[in-house]
Amino acid sequence: STQAGRVRNLEAGEICSEIYTAQKDIGERISHIVLMGIGEPLDNFDEVMRFLENISSPEGVNIGMRNISLSTCGLVPKIDQLAEKKLQLTLSVSLHAPNNDIRSGMMPVNDAYPVEVLMQAVRRYQETTGRRVSFEYSMVRGVNDSDACARQLADLIRGMGAHVNLIPINPVDGSPYSATDAANVRRFQQKLESLGVNATVRRRLGSEISAACGQLRRDEMNGKV
């Protein structure tokens, strides 16, 4: 989805309207929220903070901060700014690689905020807020799914009490990347757990009809749906 480039940031009211629309469509109260793409939530800091204030208010949807996760690709100054708010939400860091060589190839933001700088910011965030952090790790065949990568990842976050979500990537036309197969994802998870890191394999939903994360919006913009 991000291959189309940035258009604009959403305003707080627009983000709130997504919650109200979803509640109306399903006929149930929304109890948990994940702020995760398209785009970088911390790049829209003021509007996201306004949204969080509104959505957690008893006069709004009254969703507790502990039921809200906020994702970031690793904007270090914004992580520090968020820490100052001392919100009780869960920070979810899109790490995807345990070292700079691999991460810079996958995520250009790593050139500005390399792994060691990012991890320092995450530890500061934990110290300031007292909240556990989770790490998102997209599994890419032959890129970041080796035993060596598992060991490096464990060394990077061991002792933080953090949780790792392992996510087999969804196929996208024109991408050189493919997902790690299920057996090797499981092997990677077991390796992390043997090294003292709590890890979960994220379920893949919708990829068989190109409606999974990163797929549907791109296909719609390209006139395929």
What does each model-found stretch correspond to?
Residues 1-13:
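Canonical Radical SAM [4Fe-4S] cluster-binding loop centered on the CxxxCxxC motif
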Residues 6, 142, 172-173, 207-209:
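Short secondary-structure capping/turn micro-motifs that flank functional sites
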Residues 14-195, 199:
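Conserved AdoMet/S-adenosylmethionine-binding subsite of the radical SAM
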Residues 35, 202, 210:
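Short glycine- and Lys/Arg-enriched binding-loop motifs that mark or flank ligand-binding interfaces
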Residues 74, 204-205:
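Short beta->alpha linker loops
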